[in-house]
Amino acid sequence: MFVKQEFPDEIILIGGHLDSWDVGQGAHDDGSGVVHAMATLQMMKAINYQPKRTVRCVLFMNEENGQQGSKAYADASNANNEFHLAAIESDRGGFTPRGFGCEGDPETYPERFGK
């Protein structure tokens, strides 16, 4: 996790989930997402990147069974009054990227990402 001074209370979460479907071995869903999240922090450190906001890596469990891990994280985050500017997850395997999606209220995008 990187905690910085300019906006330390604004969290950008990157993550993946450790569990997989019972018939799968988990390399693509979502072992590759776990590696993507951890490698992002490693690269940020290697190039001495200094983010303006806190960057937190979270590896969830029990996502394939109703997203219980991320719901537990959200409950704890809400109880601690944390503000997450964005949450980024890679969950489509380690193949060539097919695109980038964003979910949320589009009216808040300029407010959240305009800084």
Feature roles, as predicted:
Residues 9, 22, 60-115:
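Metal-dependent peptidase/peptidase-like ectodomains
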